Amino acid sequence: MKFAVFASLLASAAAFAPAQQSARTSVATNMAFESELGAQPPLGFFDPLGLVADGDQEKFDRLRYVELKHGRISMLAVVGYLVQENGIRLPGDIDYSGTSFASIPNGFAALSTISTAGIAQIVAFIGFLEIAVMKDITGGEFPGDFRNDYIDFGWDSFDEETQFKKRAIELNQGRAAQMGILALMVHEKLGVSLIPN
């Protein structure tokens, strides 16, 4: 209760504080990134926290790379969640004690079933990927470009407009997947399934 009163006092005091004069910077920043990938209708360039208010292109590219990475991981997470909910499991055992993949429950309940050593292996593998494999590659054509001489899938056969469109589709699907996996996790905690029976 005391915290709520204190917070309301701070809010009312802030109402009479002089405003910062940053409108010109905000407009200039919006114009700098308005033509970037992801600045699409209806929002256009959307940076409510002012993370790139200084107009730093390198910082913007880093944040775009992180957004793409989280979107790709979220797309895999949504597919994995739906596959598990439909009862499709890997064959065999997850450990040497005979715990089968089929006996592990879905969602958050799986974390209590997997041993601490197993969780540590997963975290170590993700850390290895972050540090060694999926580090921020600046030599690519665009942020998140992990192509090399072995993996290409015909990307260079597309014209520039098609490449831009496909990158925008991936970005939007990644954004939707981030919201989707969060919705699945929240509903699981609430005890309400989003998956029809």
Swiss-Prot record:
Statement: the UniProt record of this protein carries the keyword Plastid: yes
An example Gene Ontology CC term for this record: photosystem II
GO molecular function terms attached to this record: chlorophyll binding
Top-rank taxon: Eukaryota
GO biological process terms on file: photosynthesis
One of the Pfam families matching this protein, by short name: Chloroa_b-bind
Subcellular localization, as worded in the UniProt entry: Plastid, Chloroplast thylakoid membrane
Sequence intervals crossing the membrane: 73-94, 114-134, 174-196
InterPro entries recorded: Chloroa_b-bind
Residue interval of the organelle targeting sequence: 1-31
Membrane topology: Multi-pass membrane protein
Keywords linked to the UniProt accession: Chlorophyll, Chloroplast, Chromophore, Light-harvesting polypeptide, Membrane, Photosynthesis, Photosystem II, Plastid, Thylakoid, Transit peptide, Transmembrane, Transmembrane helix
Subunit structure: The LHC complex of chromophytic algae is composed of fucoxanthin, chlorophyll A and C bound non-covalently by fucoxanthin chlorophyll proteins (FCPs). The ratio of the pigments in lhc; fucoxanthin: chlorophyll C: chlorophyll A is (0.6-1): (0.1-0.3): (1).
Family as reported in the entry's similarity comment: Belongs to the fucoxanthin chlorophyll protein family.
Chain's role: The light-harvesting complex (LHC) functions as a light receptor, it captures and delivers excitation energy to photosystems with which it is closely associated. In chromophytic algae, LHC is associated with photosystem II, energy being transferred from fucoxanthin and chlorophyll C to chlorophyll A and the photosynthetic reaction centers where it is used to synthesize ATP and reducing power.
Protein name: Fucoxanthin-chlorophyll a-c binding protein F, chloroplastic
Species: Phaeodactylum tricornutum (Diatom)
